[in-house]
A protein has these predicted regions:
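Conserved hydrophobic helix-helix packing surfaces used for dimerization/oligomerization
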Residues: 1-2, 99, 210
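Glycine-rich phosphate-binding loop signature in dinucleotide/nucleotide-binding domains
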Residues: 90-96, 126, 204-206
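A nucleotide-sugar donor-handling region in carbohydrate enzymes
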Residues: 134-218
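Conserved nucleotide-sugar donor-binding subdomain of glycosyltransferases
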Residues: 67-112
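Conserved nucleotide-sugar phosphate-binding/catalytic loop shared by glycosyltransferases and other
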Residues: 24-78, 84
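Active-site proximal beta-strand in glycosyltransferases
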Residues: 98, 116-137
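N-terminal subdomain of nucleotide-sugar transferases
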Residues: 1-39
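A short helix->loop->beta-strand "cap" motif at the edges of active sites that frequently abuts
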Residues: 30, 123-131, 158, 183-184
């Protein structure tokens, strides 16, 4: 049983990657609960995956440092407390074998108010789950050495770091300076993508061409 937490703040790339991973886990025989804290998204493929929507929030701006409700209202302590309680109650009811956090603690540190209690709840279970961090190929660089140290310290609670990248193309240490502190528990998985849909080429249109999408959740 897998409890998979994901929070998208601006676009939906993080959510779509998490959904792809969740579907693959479900297809492999895992009972997966995907828990999303971002805006509800129509058309999200979740075959075989259970889904739970937390009270949604988003980034107030492109800087991602300030969080807000979907209507732009700043978060208050009551909202944070309520959402944290909902998350912890759900987690304790699930009693998962694996807890996965998308990006955290190497990103989404704005969500410490609920994710640190979640880690504590996991460690307090009679049979603590494996705790896994699932990250994309590049993480946002922190200008603060103290923040990097905090990430490393928080990662002590984790069993493994899954890096969804090909090290021959992009290496995690290129964007995370404290690689030496986490590398013994890190695994490269390769990139996460859905299988190519079946299609029939339409004549010569597009033949020999490549379309590149930058920033869409690869």
């Amino acid at each position: 049983r897998v409890f998979f937490y994901v929070q998208h703040l601006l676009g939906i790339g993080h959510l779509r990657r998490a959904a792809t991973l969740a579907r693959a886990l479900a297809a492999g025989g895992f009972d997966v609960l995907l828990v999303s804290g971002g805006a509800p998204t129509e058309g999200l493929a979740l075959e075989g995956v259970r889904f739970h929507q937390l009270p949604p929030l988003r980034a107030a701006d492109a800087g991602l440092k300030v969080l807000a409700r979907l209507d732009g209202t700043p978060l208050d302590e009551a909202f944070r407390t309520d959402r944290t309680h909902r998350l912890l109650d759900l987690f304790r009811a699930e009693q998962p074998d694996v807890l996965m956090t998308e990006q955290f603690p190497f990103g989404r540190t704005q969500l410490r108010f609920e994710l640190l209690p979640l880690l504590e709840a996991a460690q307090d279970l009679p049979s603590p789950p494996w705790i896994v961090s699932s990250v994309r190929d590049v993480v946002r660089r922190s200008a603060s050495p103290a923040r990097v140290e905090e990430m490393v310290a928080t990662f002590e609670a984790f069993d493994v770091l899954l890096i969804h990248s090909d090290p021959a193309l992009v290496r995690f240490e290129e964007s995370f300076p404290a690689w030496d502190e986490v590398k013994t528990r890190a695994l490269y998985t390769g990139y996460v993508a859905d299988a190519d849909p079946a299609h029939t080429p339409h004549g010569e249109v597009g033949r020999g061409e490549v379309i590149v999408s930058v920033g869409g959740g690869a």
